[in-house]
Amino acid sequence: MAIKGLSIPVFGRYHNKDGVVTYTDGMVNPHAVSYQISLTAGDNNPFYADNRIVENDVGMFSSGILKLETDDFTAETSKYLLGLKEVTRTYGESKTATSLVYDDTQKSPVLGYGIIEEHQINEVNKYKAVILKKVVFGIPEDAATTRGEKIDWQTKTIEGAISRSDEVNDEVSHPWKEDAWFDSEAEALAFLKAMLGVGVKGQ
């Protein structure tokens, strides 16, 4: 069993009402290069008896950082992830352009995030749909290198703060992550779209 691929980040706008969490206005960003989740958890609290550990209160998840590398971010994706405003600028002889503005009013929205891992298990491809339930992305760094005789492909990386969802019901209590396995990438993507509100309009 091994991981052999990664594809298709999906995002959805997070809504909480009295512990009922929903996602709307989902967006599919079609390309992923890599992702990494770094976690912070509480300390383990072992109980010793007879000179050995007989019980252990394992530290629980408290927060995390998602690092997502993609081929690039379009203006639409940047606006969605970072809560940017659009303004229309005029230049030349009555020409106009739409600009994204980073200013004091910029506030990144709370989102759900999903991605698809491709695994090979006993010579068969399986697809793991991973969902982080509550993420807030920060403004990514800007960097670029001029083109020479040979193209040096450059990517874009963004980091997001992971926290526990507000969702509480008979099945879950403040989940921060879930995953499901599928036989095809198409089914994994359909699952992520359904869970993260792609095609569902928010109020």
Give names to the regions the model predicted:
Residues 1-82, 134-152:
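Solvent-exposed edge beta-strands and adjacent loop segments
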Residues 6-8, 12, 67, 89, ...:
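Hydrophobic transmembrane signal anchors and adjacent membrane-proximal interface regions, especially
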Residues 15, 24, 49, 92, ...:
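Compositionally biased, intrinsically disordered low-complexity regions enriched in proline and serine
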Residues 16, 87-93, 168-174:
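Intrinsically disordered, low-complexity coil segments
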Residues 23-29, 126-134, 175-180:
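Short amphipathic beta-strand/extended segments with alternating polar/hydrophobic composition
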Residues 58-130:
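Structured, beta-strand-rich domain cores
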Residues 135-203:
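Mixed-charge, glycine-accented linear interaction segment located at domain edges/termini
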